[in-house]
């Protein structure tokens, strides 16, 4: 499978499925100091709200990085994932001790879960892929439906605006030949879907989500990966303190490859 073949797949679910024949989600969040910034940040915000005995649903669970982390802290996890490659990687790591109920399915249809059955819901993968606004809203509404009243939903987006600088770091000609609208600076939504901070915020407001935090979840960590990965443990710890110092500043939120929104179901 390559990008040209992927682009020819018309069915969105199948296209998303095959995307992970190309991209290795299993190692994305853990292969280096720079890569772990997003994971560390996301866990930090989840743990602000997680209580003993909470039930967690991980929608678009990938290869299970978050599911395993919280299952091994004693939480009961339900995980739903679409892509065959991710399901296979997830299953290889499952042990009898892991309290994880893994289901292969689509984030647009959570009918296997009852209304108001989870205290915490993760929506970290689906909004990287859904292009149609109606599908985005349906996905969010399904996450809301299965979340208890007052429960917390964690949303991840890929930031449209900062990706330019990250790609420029790989390709000095990106601004002349990159795959984006040269007038509006909107990236082409392939193979992933990109949102500005404002677009992500409006999407959640439209679903009546009470936004508690807007976070630059990895900041410039990919752009600065070489330097970050060279850091001593002491320097890395201080870098993370700096990252947490700036990651919710309004002027810095969009300066990140990934965005984390923490919402409360009203």
What is the predicted role of each segment?
Residues 1-52, 65, 69, 154-179:
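Conserved class I S-adenosyl-L-methionine
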Residues 120-134:
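A short SAM/SAH-binding and catalytic strip from SAM-dependent methyltransferases
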Residues 137-149:
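A short glycine-rich, Lys/Arg-flanked "PGG" loop and its adjoining helix->strand segment in the class I
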